[in-house]
Amino acid sequence: MPERNVKVGSSVGLHARPATIFTQAASKLPVKVTIAKANGGNAVDARSVLFVLGLDVRGGDEVVLAAEGDGADAALDELEALLQRDLDKE
């Protein structure tokens, strides 16, 4: 299963708006994606806004994205690019 470490670009982290944008993007992908804090936290379903909010990811934190299935690398590319942006300013 491919993984990516990504530094979160949103200045205040994955609060309601950025988490919603992220989970909506993950929900549209044809593969299963998980997200976890890079410090060894539990991986959660990237399609669930409640699970993503529960990670308490702050701006500048590093997360680990993992995807399973055909197209996993492309899915990770898309979500990595999304998380690196400051979604609070969009």
Each model region followed by its residue ranges:
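Intrinsic-disorder/low-complexity, polar/charged segments enriched in Ser/Thr/Lys/Arg/Asp/Glu/Gln
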Residues: 1-5, 62-64
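C-terminal structural segments of small proteins and small subunits
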Residues: 54-90
